[in-house]
């Protein structure tokens, strides 16, 4: 090594010289794999497995119980219903909320898995279409993580995924439940204000790939901005959808309202905001899956009623 701390690096100046040797202390070089136990799980691998396990529902009993108490499902349950079994490849699951000045890392790993955004690629309707046509991108906000709010790292994740969706022309299904921008993240690590392109990139997908918006529960502010860019909005009867949530309304001096009073379906469906209203969360996924199939190609097998009966729909005598 030719350099020391504080030295100026000049162009074409060698920094490190590497000498190639044929042996190690007179013995034969080996990578150690010949004698390694293939079933052994090293501590570093075990740590990785444990970290991934923290993101799964079976290891989040409190969040699951709280969600089920409201009659709602976990985001991963919706994804499991939507995609073909075993096909979901999650992107960046080990990130946590950028709140390191407020919480220790173990607390963040327990309470803010994936920074509240579960996302990745999967196969949808693979039993009907080939591998290429069944590929899709799934992005689901997780309301059990800080009310589904949008954090810095969740934005970085979405920036990457929306870029990939555009590059590979993947249809995108968005589960939008959440409270919009998150005010509690800190500036730990590299960070520049407004350095993400989530909203721009998502809106640029409009007209390029099918955008399917699905909502159950409360959807406000930034989450609503993404939902509004979708080609179709499928919502359950328990949904409330609005650009400004109760806190923003109260802060603006416009009164105090509960979340259920802001953008209920009794208002948004007649308004034309919601395209398809369904009864519950499970049905939103069923409809989204069926809607997506309309853009995935032609069915190899299908059936239809006898069309000849239509010949007799119009009466021969128009005045009878």
Where do the model's predicted regions map?
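Short alpha-helical segments and helix-capping/turn motifs at coil-helix boundaries
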Residues: 104-107, 115-119, 155-161, 197-198, ...
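Extended active-site and interfacial segments that coordinate phosphate-rich ligands
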Residues: 139-165, 170, 231-233, 239-260
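Intrinsically disordered, low-complexity segments enriched in small/flexible residues
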Residues: 21, 27-135, 140-146, 267, ...
């Amino acid at each position: 090594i030719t350099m020391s701390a504080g030295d100026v690096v000049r162009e074409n100046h060698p920094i490190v010289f590497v000498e190639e040797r044929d042996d190690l202390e007179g013995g034969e070089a080996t990578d150690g794999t010949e004698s390694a136990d293939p079933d052994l799980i090293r501590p570093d691998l075990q740590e990785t497995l444990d970290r991934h396990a923290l993101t799964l529902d079976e290891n989040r009993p409190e969040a699951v119980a709280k969600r089920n108490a409201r009659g709602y499902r976990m985001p991963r349950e919706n994804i499991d219903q939507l995609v073909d079994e075993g096909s979901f490849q999650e992107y960046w699951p080990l990130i946590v909320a950028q709140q390191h000045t407020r919480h220790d890392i173990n607390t963040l790993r327990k309470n803010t898995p994936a920074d509240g955004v579960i996302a990745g690629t999967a196969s949808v309707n693979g039993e009907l279409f080939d591998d290429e046509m069944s590929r899709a991108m799934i992005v689901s906000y997780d309301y059990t993580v800080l009310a589904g709010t949008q954090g810095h790292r969740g934005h970085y994740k979405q920036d990457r995924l929306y870029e990939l969706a555009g590059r590979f022309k993947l249809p995108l299904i968005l589960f939008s439940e959440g409270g919009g921008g998150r005010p509690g993240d800190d500036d730990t690590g590299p960070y520049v204000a407004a350095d993400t392109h989530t909203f721009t990139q998502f809106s640029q997908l409009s007209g390029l790939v099918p955008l399917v918006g699905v909502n159950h529960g409360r959807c406000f502010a930034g989450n609503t901005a993404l939902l509004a860019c979708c080609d179709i909005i499928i919502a359950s009867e328990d949904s409330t959808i609005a650009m400004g949530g109760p806190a923003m309304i109260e802060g603006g001096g416009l009164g105090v309202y509960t979340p259920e009073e802001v953008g209920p379906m009794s208002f948004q469906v007649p308004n034309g905001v919601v395209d398809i209203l369904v009864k519950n969360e499970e049905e939103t996924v069923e409809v989204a899956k069926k809607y997506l199939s309309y853009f995935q190609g032609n069915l190899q097998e299908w059936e239809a009623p006898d069309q000849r009966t239509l010949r007799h729909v119009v009466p021969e005598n128009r005045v009878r």
